[in-house]
Structure formats: structure tokens, C-alpha cells
Regions:
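N-terminal acidic, glycine/proline-rich low-complexity segments
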Residues: 1-117
Length: 117
């Protein structure tokens, strides 16, 4: 199964949730899952902290084969690399991508707004 994880990962940020990081670790280790990318969104923290924290997590885990993409800063900020990645990846793999969205849903709304098909 090809998966994109859309999340607000703050695993490693003091006094923050760890669920997103654990979700990624589970998906990445599962033999039937191919993680196509991680799209970062705000919620547990701002998009900057979430993005750079996710990059740090990937470095700590020595994972270099999964792209990490930064989402918009606020609701309605739909023109971001995360939105473009979601739209492009789904369009290039029709019917093959499962999006697991566990963050603010801003990237999902942006992808739908950009390309409702």
C-alpha cells in the first residue's frame, strides 16, 4: 500500500504529543506499506517547528528515502510544497495512494481546492 502521511509531528519537542512520530515509525516499518512522503501541517505547533522537527526525526532515524514537505502557515494557505506534492503524487498514481491525515487537514483542504478530481 502506498501511503502519504499528513501530520503535525512534534515527537521530540518538549511537552508535545508523540503520536505522529510513532505513526510514521509504524508505517515505515510495516512490510506492506510504502511511505511516499510526509506532508507537514500546523496544529501541535506552527508549520516551521513541525517541518524542521520532522526533518530532525528522519535524520535521527537515518531515513533518507522519504521526502518531507512543508505545508501552509495558516488555514487557507493552500499554495505550499505539501499541497503540490499531494496533488502531483495522487494524480501520478490514480487509485493507488492512501492519505493518512492526522494533523490540521489544511493540506488536505488545499489539495482538494487545487484539484477536486
Amino acid at each position: 500500500m502506498k501511503v502519504i502521511l499528513d501530520c503535525d509531528n512534534t515527537m521530540g519537542v518538549r511537552k508535545s504529543d508523540v503520536d505522529d512520530g510513532l505513526t510514521f515509525a509504524y508505517l515505515y516499518a510495516h512490510p506492506d506499506v510504502e511511505v511516499q512522503g510526509i506532508t507537514c501541517t500546523f496544529a501541535n505547533n506552527n508549520e516551521h517547528v513541525v517541518y524542521y522537527n520532522t526533518l530532525q526525526m528522519m535524520e535521527d532515524l537515518e531515513i533518507t528515502d522519504v521526502p518531507v514537505l512543508k505545508g501552509g502557515r495558516t488555514p487557507g494557505a493552500y499554495d505550499s510544497e505539501a499541497v503540490n506534492f499531494l496533488v502531483d503524487t495522487v494524480n501520478k498514481n490514480p487509485g493507488e495512494i492512501t492519505v493518512i491525515a492526522i494533523g490540521s487537514m489544511c493540506n488536505i483542504a488545499g489539495a482538494y481546492t487545487k484539484d477536486p478530481e
